[in-house]
Amino acid sequence: MGDLELLLPGEAEVLVRGLRSFPLREMGSEGWNQQHENLEKLNMQAILDATVSQGEPIQELLVTHGKVPTLVEELIAVEMWKQKVFPVFCRVEDFKPQNTFPIYMVVHHEASIINLLETVFFHKEVCESAEDTVLDLVDYCHRKLTLLVAQSGCGGPPEGEGSQDSNPMQELQKQAELMEFEIALKALSVLRYITDCVDSLSLSTLSRMLSTHNLPCLLVELLEHSPWSRREGGKLQQFEGSRWHTVAPSEQQKLSKLDGQVWIALYNLLLSPEAQARYCLTSFAKGRLLKLRAFLTDTLLDQLPNLAHLQSFLAHLTLTETQPPKKDLVLEQIPEIWERLERENRGKWQAIAKHQLQHVFSPSEQDLRLQARRWAETYRLDVLEAVAPERPRCAYCSAEASKRCSRCQNEWYCCRECQVKHWEKHGKTCVLAAQGDRAK
């Protein structure tokens, strides 16, 4: 890694050991912000480690110090904050902050954690170290994928461009909606990695996936709707790397990463002996699963040869008698994080919002400048470029870009015209980022 090493030897371990869960009331506080910055550093370091294939020290540290359950709890806590507290801010008419970056950091926290989990859950020992919280994580992924299917039935994800008349809080709401789409796609990858461990998952987790949530049928719906693909102007586009990209005609038969994740998850859930012993093939499930036959083309089988086993399974399924829903009396563990957090904070959402409005999200200009400096130090440009999956894209038109905003050095553009058109939206954050650089 050389010069691209973000964390010094020993520094990553200190950051991992310091990870802890925060009450919802403390989200956005100074201590919480410090942990958010630490998570971002761990996130970028984990991606760098995976990119250069020099072991996975971040993943090993998370397992060694038992911090995967902490990440899962923080993930669900910020999800609850976004559902219960953030809407209260948006309804307060006289709350018009000069800068919404402190709130944006909390909104973005969920994306930071799910991105880190996606990077490290590739390794089975990480899934195993989640212990009982894997149940909570399965529920979380199910919530996200259910919303993804529902959204695809209502016209797809929101567009990133905002209205000229929108105020900062309305703009933040739109950013949060777009972020939800990206988070759901990350949750799909995490779920697929959990299914890779199907042979070592507890019976309670298997039952949750197969009986409570019927994930195979939900995955079939995802394949049918393919929310990460769309047609624009007669051209096929796919969502990858936080942007929509036009797919060249010669590449359109190529299996996308997200479609591949769905197929692998289906393979794991339908063909592993452990899952087959737990999955009840009702007439509804049989009808849904047989829809997969239309997708199993020769082109797909050439790219994922193991799906030939799934094709044989479906051929056998056509001749199989369906089963009535099982009504076995079984003692099982249930997810507890969401329920516990809701019980602890029930009836307090308004009070939490009021406290945070007064003490957290109304910082002085000096506090904002100090925070901007810390952000600039966290998001080092050389590291961001190293972890980027491809060449930068224009912030306005998504074409390949070669020019960077001279003031903040954060946004990329393909030409001067696009930069001018994007300024109305970008200018709000550009000034603060530039102040952070000057404050160094």
From Swiss-Prot:
Spans annotated as Interaction with DNAAF11: 366-440
Pfam families, alphabetized: zf-MYND
Disulfide bond sites: none
Keywords, ordered alphabetically: Cell membrane, Ciliopathy, Cytoplasm, Cytoskeleton, Disease variant, Kartagener syndrome, Membrane, Metal-binding, Primary ciliary dyskinesia, Zinc, Zinc-finger
GO MF annotation, one: molecular adaptor activity
Subcellular location per the Swiss-Prot or TrEMBL entry: Cytoplasm; Cytoplasm, Cytoskeleton, Microtubule organizing center, Centrosome, Centriolar satellite; Apical cell membrane; Dynein axonemal particle
Binding site for Zn(2+) 2: 405, 408, 426, 430
Binding site residues for Zn(2+) 1: 394, 397, 414, 418
Gene Ontology cellular component terms for the protein in this record: apical plasma membrane; centriolar satellite; cytoplasm; dynein axonemal particle
InterPro entries reported for this sequence: UCP037948_Znf-MYND, ZMYND10, Znf_MYND
GO biological process: cilium movement; inner dynein arm assembly; motile cilium assembly; outer dynein arm assembly; positive regulation of motile cilium assembly; protein localization to cilium
Main subcellular location of this protein, as a coarse class: cytoplasm
UniProt zinc finger (MYND-type) residues: 394-430
Role played: Plays a role in axonemal structure organization and motility. Involved in axonemal pre-assembly of inner and outer dynein arms (IDA and ODA, respectively) for proper axoneme building for cilia motility. May act by indirectly regulating transcription of dynein proteins.
Family of the protein in this entry: Belongs to the ZMYND10 family.
Illness association: Ciliary dyskinesia, primary, 22: A disorder characterized by abnormalities of motile cilia. Respiratory infections leading to chronic inflammation and bronchiectasis are recurrent, due to defects in the respiratory cilia. Patients may exhibit randomization of left-right body asymmetry and situs inversus, due to dysfunction of monocilia at the embryonic node. Primary ciliary dyskinesia associated with situs inversus is referred to as Kartagener syndrome.
PANTHER family per the UniProt record, alphabetical: ZINC FINGER MYND DOMAIN CONTAINING PROTEIN 10 (PTHR13244), ZINC FINGER MYND DOMAIN-CONTAINING PROTEIN 10 (PTHR13244:SF7)
Record's subunit section: Interacts (via C-terminus) with DNAAF11 (via CS domain); this interaction stabilizes DNAAF11 at the protein level. Interacts (via C-terminus) with DNAL1; this interaction stabilizes DNAL1 at the protein level. Interacts with DNAAF4, HSPA8, IQUB, RUVBL2 and DYNTL5.
Designated name of the protein: Zinc finger MYND domain-containing protein 10
Species per Swiss-Prot/TrEMBL record: Homo sapiens (Human)
Biological classification of the source: Eukaryota, Metazoa, Chordata, Craniata, Vertebrata
